[in-house]
Amino acid sequence: GEWVRENILVDEPTCHSCPVACKKEVEVDVEVGGEEHQIRMESLEYEPAFTFGSNSMSDDAEVTAVLIDRCNKYGIDAIESGNMLAMAMEMTEKRQVEDGIDWGDHDAMYEMLRKIAEREGELADTLADGAAGVAKRFDAEDSRLDVKNQTIPAYDPRSMKGMAIGYATSNRGACHLRGYTPAAEILGIPEAVDPADPEGKGELQVTFQDLHAISDSFDICKFNAFAEGIEEYVLQYNGMTGRDVSEEELIEAGKRIYTLERYYNNLVG
């Protein structure tokens, strides 16, 4: 973050009237894949900066920006794509695949993203379908880090027990946004808890899952949600609808949303 601010940050715009103003813009000028890239884009988000950066043994933030931009232009998820490249790198190191890619090879990473998007070649075609299929096709279960075929993001479940439970129980796989317990485990919001202590983390995760089901329904971003809780949600909902629901009723709605999602997953297998 410090390097980005000192070297490539050019603007700090924001969504209309937002008090958080989290958006940043960067400009990079770097050669990757035999091409010169002059790009202005939203800044390196934490998750894909991890998957294309340290998780792939790369320390070049400008190259990471190019790779994220390439994913955006192809319409593929940058977190998942970076993790799939890292999985391919590990399988290459273990000689589980031929024509793979080496750790930190920026040109190969850039080209593999194109191959994944266009499903070119056996490895890229399999990577495009996620970790579960790759592990089965190439006998690489030991390189697989996913839940419901969604790879884990940048919050290590070994050190954050609440997040570990979140990955295991999220309706969409290893997602950090369905129940963001790092708010309490790292940031101390609404109060600090020991991230390594498993005690009470099931209840904590359920609380965050229910609250996020509500905030997602309200279309409130997670950064604003840090400053709000059920009291504010009740005021907003009642003010928008003219109804008079209680905190308990709104929390129950969050539980019903999460349960309905799980019911649908079970229904379709």
Task: Give short role names for the model-derived ranges.
Residues 1-269:
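Extended C-terminal regions of large enzymes
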